[in-house]
UniProtKB/Swiss-Prot annotation:
<feature type="active site" description="Proton acceptor; for kinase activity">
    <location>
        <position position="452"/>
    </location>
</feature>
<keyword id="KW-0547">Nucleotide-binding</keyword>
<feature type="domain" description="Protein kinase">
    <location>
        <begin position="339"/>
        <end position="533"/>
    </location>
</feature>
<feature type="binding site">
    <location>
        <begin position="347"/>
        <end position="354"/>
    </location>
    <ligand>
        <name>ATP</name>
    </ligand>
</feature>
<dbReference type="GO" id="GO:0000408">
    <property type="term" value="C:EKC/KEOPS complex"/>
</dbReference>
<keyword id="KW-0479">Metal-binding</keyword>
<keyword id="KW-0418">Kinase</keyword>
<dbReference type="GO" id="GO:0008270">
    <property type="term" value="F:zinc ion binding"/>
</dbReference>
<feature type="binding site">
    <location>
        <begin position="133"/>
        <end position="137"/>
    </location>
    <ligand>
        <name>L-threonylcarbamoyladenylate</name>
    </ligand>
</feature>
<feature type="binding site">
    <location>
        <position position="165"/>
    </location>
    <ligand>
        <name>L-threonylcarbamoyladenylate</name>
    </ligand>
</feature>
<feature type="region of interest" description="Kae1">
    <location>
        <begin position="1"/>
        <end position="328"/>
    </location>
</feature>
<keyword id="KW-0723">Serine/threonine-protein kinase</keyword>
<dbReference type="InterPro" id="IPR043129">
    <property type="entry name" value="ATPase_NBD"/>
</dbReference>
<dbReference type="InterPro" id="IPR034680">
    <property type="entry name" value="Kae1_archaea_euk"/>
</dbReference>
<dbReference type="InterPro" id="IPR009220">
    <property type="entry name" value="tRNA_threonyl_synthase/kinase"/>
</dbReference>
<comment type="function">
    <text>Required for the formation of a threonylcarbamoyl group on adenosine at position 37 (t(6)A37) in tRNAs that read codons beginning with adenine. Is a component of the KEOPS complex that is probably involved in the transfer of the threonylcarbamoyl moiety of threonylcarbamoyl-AMP (TC-AMP) to the N6 group of A37. The Kae1 domain likely plays a direct catalytic role in this reaction. The Bud32 domain probably displays kinase activity that regulates Kae1 function.</text>
</comment>
<feature type="binding site">
    <location>
        <position position="182"/>
    </location>
    <ligand>
        <name>L-threonylcarbamoyladenylate</name>
    </ligand>
</feature>
């Protein structure tokens, strides 16, 4: 079978021919290069209109020359349906519809972000991976569950590549900015910048503002580039590890154009090696936007019968990956976590190694060799202090938490009471989720947040539901911060539960009984602000 793929979501006009028989993938691309500054949507669309017919023509000629007859011999057309820039997508959609009618072959509408994931799955052979997509307009973590790729975590403002480009435009550098930052960082020293992780979600806007201010205040550009790269990529690596810990997966796939950065791949590889996980990053031609990944996913969708009619083939600039029904992997195992049983054997979480000693638990935040040493020391100490203080503060409010016996921020070590029999994930019931909502409402009314209230960070037994691991928590009266706590919990339930809807309803009901009235309306705002809602 031979599939023609067409890509053109933003800057890359690309066509590809994928032969499933011998796994050959021929790609022809013509990227848009602005004369100055960043990517201009109108100019990108004009480039797409000119370049896309040319790359398609080249691939069609290749299809004829590589076939056994003079016929083109293409079985289906797959195209990027979204997400992306509307004007560019419309050019792609028109080209795909024209070809499918001219050749009388089926049409397949592909989600661009799932294609970034699936090319890595296809080439690695992984069975239940978490995928980190790091591209220009996007950054998110995906895992297959309940016939969808669930979003386990994502940027709450801008994509990682776009964030870096905003900084480089401030310097007067033209698009793309990522390779220029990578080159400059080789000569710089680490400069401290804000580090914003909330559960498995993250934010780049504050980092960009701080980086611009640093340059304006005459901090050497190379130092700011080093700090920017170390901070952003450490955040992405941390949330990837958190996703592995939450789901229990031991496989990580990297996708997206930012994945071409050597330092990001080094960090992810180091993290996976440390926790005994496998890591796969496709070669560069499959990381940047390309039609090869569209053709490969298109072939899988075609074999599963997931084609569309021309009348139903409208492009979607806001096409989220979790809106796609994944029929081509319908019989596969979900990315779901085996709940931890904390006995005397050490248990490794995302941040720490935890060991039970009789009725005590010793938790040590381990050094993360992927992070810059200065950043690592800062985070380990800050989070150990926060966990000790906020765990005790929550307990004083009547929220079930373990007693803290000792805390050493310098070594990142805590000693606390052993509580619960297993994680909430092992007994994820309506009543327990209702109780978690009540607990979060109480701490929010007291002026602080948990920071990472996933099903991994609630311990349960027959009598209680204990909140643990307040390391990402902090004091705040901002409704946005409180709503993010709710968002993190709901996201963890959605990504792992077999029937999340009644659990989420119970959780929100519990919060309404004890929490702040404006928080749930802000939660709806946050959900609508996620990338491409």
């Amino acid at each position: 079978m031979r599939i023609l793929g067409i890509e053109g979501t933003a800057w890359a006009a690309s066509a590809a021919l994928y032969n499933t028989h011998d796994e050959t993938i021929v790609i022809e691309s013509d990227p848009y290069q602005p004369d100055s500054g960043g990517l201009h949507p109108r100019e990108a669309a004009e480039h797409m209109s000119t370049a896309l017919p040319e790359v398609i023509s080249t691939i069609l000629e290749r299809a004829v020359s590589s076939g056994n007859t003079d016929a083109i011999g293409i079985d289906a057309i797959a195209f990027s349906r979204g997400p992306g820039l509307g004007p560019c997508l419309r050019v792609v959609g028109t080209a795909a519809r024209t070809l499918t009618q001219a050749l009388s072959v089926p049409l397949i509408g592909v989600n661009h972000m799932i294609a970034h994931l699936e090319i890595g799955r296809h080439q690695s052979g992984f069975t239940t991976p978490v995928c980190l997509n790091a591209s220009g307009a996007n950054a998110h973590l995906l895992g297959y569950h309940r016939r969808q790729y669930q979003v386990l975590g994502e940027t709450m403002d801008t994509g990682v590549g776009n964030a870096i480009d905003k900084f480089t435009r401030h310097l007067g550098w033209n698009h793309p900015g990522g390779p220029k930052v990578e080159a400059a960082a080789t000569d710089g020293s680490y400069h401290d910048l804000p580090y914003v992780v909330k559960g498995m979600d993250f934010s780049f806007s504050g980092i960009m503002s701080a980086a611009k201010d640093a340059v304006d205040n005459e901090v050497p550009v190379v130092d700011v580039c080093t700090g920017l790269q170390e901070t952003i990529f450490a955040m992405l690596t941390e949330v990837a590890e958190r996703a592995l810990s939450l789901t229990g997966s031991n496989e990580l796939v990297l996708g997206g154009g930012v994945g071409q950065n050597d330092r990001l791949r080094e960090m992810l590889s180091t993290m996976c090696t440390a926790r005994g996980a496998s890591f796969y990053a496709p070669e560069s031609r499959f990381l940047r936007d390309n039609a090869g990944m569209i053709a490969v996913l298109g072939a899988a969708m075609y074999e599963a019968g997931q084609t569309i009619s021309v009348n139903d083939s409208a492009v979607d600039p806001t096409f989220r990956p979790d809106a796609v029904t994944v029929t081509w992997r319908d019989d596969e195992t979900s990315v779901t976590r085996t709940p931890a049983t904390l006995d005397k054997t050490p248990v490794r979480g995302a941040e720490a190694i935890v060991r039970r000693i009789n009725d005590h638990v010793v938790k040590r935040r381990v050094e993360k060799s992927y992070r810059h040493p200065k950043l690592d020391r800062r985070l380990r100490a800050e989070r150990t202090r926060a966990e000790a203080r906020l765990t005790s503060a929550a307990r004083r409010l009547g929220v079930p938490t373990p007693l803290i016996f000792d805390a050493d921020p310098e070594t990142g070590t805590l000693v606390f009471e052993y509580v619960g029999e297993t994680d909430l994930a092992a007994d994820l019931t309506v009543s327990r989720c209702h109780a978690v909502g009540q607990h979060l409402g109480r701490i929010h009314n007291a002026g602080f947040v948990h920071g990472d209230p996933t099903t991994r960070n609630v311990r349960v037994d027959s009598a209680q539901n204990y909140l643990i691991d307040f390391g990402l928590g902090y004091h705040t009266d901002h409704v946005e911060d409180h709503a993010m706590d709710l968002h993190v919990f709901i996201q963890s339930v959605t990504g792992t539960a077999s029937d999340p809807a009644p659990l989420i309803t119970a959780f929100e009901s519990g919060y309404a009984e004890t929490g702040i009235s404006t928080v749930q309306s802000r939660l709806r705002d946050i959900e609508s602000r996620g990338r491409y809602h």
